[in-house]
Amino acid sequence: MERKEFKAESKRLLEMMVNSIYSQKEIFLRELISNASDAIDKIYYRALSDDSITFNKDDYFIKVTANKEDRTLTVSDTGIGMTKEELESNLGTIAKSGSLAFKTENESKDGHDIIGQFGVGFYSAFMVADKVTVTTKALGEESGYQWESTGADGYTILPIAKESVGTEIRLKLKENSEDESYDEFLEEYRLTSIIKKYSDFIRYPIKMDVTKRELKEGTEDEYEDVIEEQTINSMVPIWRKNKNELKDEDYTNFYHEKRYGFDQPLKHIHISVDGAVRYNAILFIPENIPFDYYTKEFEKGLELYSNGVLIMEKCPDLLPDYYSFVKGMVDSEDLSLNISREMLQHDRQLKLIAKNIKNKITSHLKTLLKDEREKFEQFYRSFGRQLKYGVYSDFGANKEDLQDLLLFYSSTEKKMVTLDEYVSRMKEDQPYIYYATGESYARIEKLPQTEMVADKGYEILYFTEDVDEFAIKMLASYKEKEFRSVSSGDLGFEDDEQKDTAADTDEQKELFEHMKTILDGKVKDVRASKRLKSHPVCLTAEGEVSIEMEKVLRAMPDNQNVQAEKVLEINVNHDVFDVLKASFESDKDKVDLYTKLLYNQALLIEGLPVEDPVAFSNDICKVMA
């Protein structure tokens, strides 16, 4: 018996492949099953051009057998088998792929696809086995051969008698160590789990002898273990079925089988693309926010399959962050994988798929908004924040795609509205899209700054989430209409009463300068208000940072004490202003007291903390005394 050396190359190369290429030892079973599937595919291809070969799919299968006594695990198939030369070529040369060569010769025949593209998957068996024995008989050959190896020291090939065509790979599992237990790969439940996880959609039956507990014949309460051969895999993936054949409950069952969520899917998206890149996908929008969605433990990503074989449980590159809530899977024949079939060799195809998926999700959400408004609003309550982050992130690169999906509460409609609906109702003389920010709709409605805009009959959008104003600042405008906060210095309109107010402000310049001095460092300016009607005072902001944005930024762990440029506005038509004027002429100490009170009052209205609550309390007591 002649021992032969591996053609490519040494113990170090094999050790690198076994120890470095694969991240999880369980992958070996996926690789051996994929190779077995390829072997059956090759008979199918041969039958296409050879009338003497009849391909009846029911005759072909893969069998996985565990023997605890011998500590062996066997994967056998009824595929095409290998000749002695093919054993030498495919198994005697590390990183030589018979499947890849076969695929190249038989490109795109009748939709069947060879899974294995590298000659490395077989060698993953050495991650769990001390010895690997391959017995095989090729189609059309009279005798079979046995290939055997214990690793990098080489291999032997012997002729053997074998009746049936096909290949059997028997692994002699390693002994357990302190760090690793190889017994798990002899356990029925573990093998079943691995097959379902990675190879559930292999197109041929994967069979196993399964132990069942049954009532012993002739008894009423005595049970016995019965061995029954079962097909473990589903074989036909739902995503390759015609959409017209599937019902909503089929998608819901798939959602639960894959454990994408414990809730019901709000929407499913079934995609089949055959263009620049070919892929199938089934995506789900969950009904509820996952419990860990806003934690660092949450991982975005879709399951990624290559020809029905799972290669990545969560591929993050398939989804943009703002669609991270989407669950589901993608299967493609066009992926360029690395030799371990666990990672992508380069990402051109993946980028094309990801771009297409992003566009499909956006399109389906727009359709949902148009045709099923109630369901869309349910979705928006859960994931609207993510869409706003999408508008704001990446310097607004995605704002054009997402702006028509945004909803905000309307002051006039008393419900959520789109930006398009708002603009369609704008009055002819209305210069801006107005918005107000606050912690709740009820608080916003009471803001002094909303009075003038509301009295003009203009609709106001209410922003109650911390990301709202950041997203709108990034949008800047919608359909050539700029966004304008009701707290901004210029509201875009001025009536006669406001012009008179401006004149009054000029007359009282000395008073406002004095108040500004008292509030030195706290406000940029004190001025007469053009927006207040019934309220005596309010705070507004100038510049890019609004008061609401200041609150958000200051709440962040790494805040840099960002502050809005605040302006204290005084209603010169209010009785309080008359008191201020009179005090300025007779008792400036009272002006100081009133100024501080008005400033703190304005802070409270905005939901900002009073800087010195004790001093504020004392000032109130002074007024009451």
From Swiss-Prot:
The keyword ATP-binding applies. PROSITE patterns: HSP90. Keywords: ATP-binding, Chaperone, Cytoplasm, Nucleotide-binding, Stress response. Residues 342-551 are annotated as: B. InterPro entries: HATPase_C_sf, Heat_shock_protein_90_CS, HSP90_C, Hsp90_fam, Hsp90_N, Ribosomal_Su5_D2-typ_SF. Molecular chaperone. Has ATPase activity. Belongs to the heat shock protein 90 family. This is Chaperone protein HtpG. The gene is htpG.
